[in-house]
UniProtKB/Swiss-Prot annotation:
It comes from Bos taurus. Its main location: endoplasmic reticulum. This is Cytochrome b5. The modification N6-acetyllysine is found at K7, K10, K19. It is a single-pass membrane protein. The keyword Metal-binding applies. Belongs to the cytochrome b5 family. Cytochrome b5 is a membrane-bound hemoprotein functioning as an electron carrier for several membrane-bound oxygenases. The chain crosses the membrane at residues 109-131. The keyword Zinc-finger does not apply. The gene is CYB5A. It comes from the Eukaryota. It is found in: Endoplasmic reticulum membrane; Microsome membrane.
Length: 134
């Protein structure tokens, strides 16, 4: 007999997932899928602390930032227990566009000219004092 491929999807609310945020029950969300990683904590190559920090919440951004291998992605599928309920998907923070604080691209004149000029004068003064002693 063929395995039933159209199993009903088990949905979990965000509130329910957030309760599983400890070493006895470690759940997290990746791409709206819910994973129970409790039994994988000690086997995780990055250490169990990494998973426990993300437990009970959405770890999608951190998971993608690490750049997991194809093998790791395949292994992760074995821990899927369901999906985040569609009503709660808007509640998790999507990876925000990072706010980058930039320094003015046109720095003031003193950083471009005054500091190098003072440095050059200082070097010239030291050179002059050094050569006048001989």
């Amino acid at each position: 007999m063929a395995e039933e491929s159209s199993k009903a999807v088990k949905y979990y609310t965000l509130e329910e997932i957030q309760k599983h945020n400890n070493s006895k029950s470690t759940w997290l969300i990746l791409h709206y899928k819910v994973y129970d990683l409790t039994k994988f904590l000690e086997e995780h190559p990055g250490g169990e602390e990494v998973l426990r920090e993300q437990a009970g919440g959405d770890a999608t951004e951190n998971f993608e930032d690490v750049g997991h291998s194809t093998d790791a992605r395949e292994l992760s599928k074995t821990f899927i227990i369901g999906e985040l309920h569609p009503d709660d998907r808007s509640k998790i923070t999507k990876p925000s566009e990072s706010i980058i604080t930039t320094i003015d691209s046109n720095p003031s004149w003193w950083t471009n000219w005054l500091i190098p000029a003072i440095s050059a004068l200082f070097v010239a003064l030291i050179y002059h004092l050094y050569t006048s002693e001989n």
